[in-house]
Amino acid sequence: MVMGVVVAVVVVIIGIRTSHGSRADAPDCAVVKCVALTFDDGPGPYTDRLLEILKANDARSTFFMIGNKVAANPAGAKRVADAGMEIGSHTWEHPNMVAIPADDVAAQFAKANDAIVAATGRTPTLYRPAGGLSNDLVRQTAAHYGLAEILWDVIPFDWYNDANTAATRYMLMTQIKPGSVVLFHDTYSSTVDLVYQFIPVLKANGYHLVTVSELLGHRTPGSSYGSRENGPPANQLHDIPAEEIPSLPHTPSPKPMPNFPITDIPGANSGGPNNGA
């Protein structure tokens, strides 16, 4: 009887761990082509539509959420988690983490973790610093909270090219390779539109869309990663015929949400509401 209980507990623990960032049937990214699309600064007004697009394409992604936005919209964060996506921390207020006092660095991690756990029941294991700005102190503090640092190797500047998605698309076409971690923001309707039309290109090129944890495996807390370095050979993406690119549906504009990412710590703003990460 005791053995049965132990086995049951182990199964439950493994199930929780698997559902957190990776699937039991996740592809082997050392063998097949994988890419991790990541989305910063949510949850926001376009997150739900993005979630439906990902689910319809059997795609998994990692969402680096700002803690105070999660606290303001816990139901939105839970919907992302319940859909099988991975949620990482983007700190509590999106400050420049290298410009704030050590105590504030710890608070940024602690408060964001608490908000994510309260909303989703899951403790994040990954974080992304605002603007990619980090140092040894930030990473050491992150380690205390069980967090590994995830950066990127493809940054298509979707916030800068909000009105010029052709430029964003060109960067994706020329930069993505097996093992890439792509930085997007789900706070822009243009980004969601682009993802909707670009996923068919990735799938036509044989890519599996996975979470960061599925791409990289377990990462040591306090360590830093930008992409996966071992995998299939890199080949440039081939475009698909225009008629195979799905037309954008008419979607009503969602109600605006307050923009939280600017920190209230004096002199510690990372560069604006959406400064690139």
Stretches found by the model and what they are:
Residues 26-29, 57, 70-71, 190-267, ...:
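C-terminal domain-boundary segment and adjacent tail
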Residues 42, 66-68, 92, 130-132, ...:
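Active-site beta-loop-alpha junctions enriched in small/polar residues
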Residues 50, 138, 198:
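Aromatic/hydrophobic pocket-lining residues that form π-stacking "cages" and hydrophobic walls in ligand
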Residues 20-120, 201, 217:
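Active-site beta->alpha N-cap acidic-glycine motif
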Residues 77-79, 103-105, 165-167, 224-228:
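Short low-complexity, flexible loop/linker segments enriched in glycine and/or proline
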Residues 93-123, 131-178, 191-194:
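Alpha-helical scaffold elements lining the catalytic groove of polysaccharide deacetylases
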